[in-house]
């Protein structure tokens, strides 16, 4: 799961500077940088604040963060076929 990278991609797509997202989320810019670079894993309450500040539902952030390694073997084929299409549709939402 690439949660930090997903947060960074959404932030950049929405053209929100890192310092603004950090401020709106109630965390420091340094901590947000660590999250975005997958050096730290935020707790659920921090994720909720980041999600709110990004105006993006938390389940959507989790979904976009999934990689094939996160999916059970029995479901990898369908995930690999559906995931790119769903991500493309979702990117239009963001």
Language model: regions and residue ranges:
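Short basic helix-loop element that most often maps to the first helix and adjoining turn
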Residues: 5-24, 76, 83-84
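Conserved hydrophobic/aromatic packing and binding residues within compact polymer-binding modules
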Residues: 7, 21-22, 32-35, 61
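Helix-turn-helix/winged-helix DNA-binding modules
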Residues: 13, 39-42, 53
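Recognition helix of helix-turn-helix/homeodomain-like DNA-binding domains
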Residues: 26-41
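Hydrophobic micro-packing sites on short alpha-helices
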Residues: 46-54, 60-62
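Short, charged recognition helix plus adjacent turn
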Residues: 62-94
């Amino acid at each position: 799961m690439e949660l930090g990278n997903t947060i960074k991609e959404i932030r950049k797509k929405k053209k929100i500077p890192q310092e603004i997202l950090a401020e709106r989320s109630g965390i420091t810019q340094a901590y947000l940088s660590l999250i975005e670079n997958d050096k730290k894993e935020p707790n659920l309450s921090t994720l909720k604040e980041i999600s709110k500040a990004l105006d993006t539902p938390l389940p959507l952030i989790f979904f976009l963060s999934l990689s094939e390694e996160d999916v059970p073997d029995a479901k990898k084929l369908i995930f690999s076929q559906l995931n790119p299409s769903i991500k493309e549709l979702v990117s239009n939402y963001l």
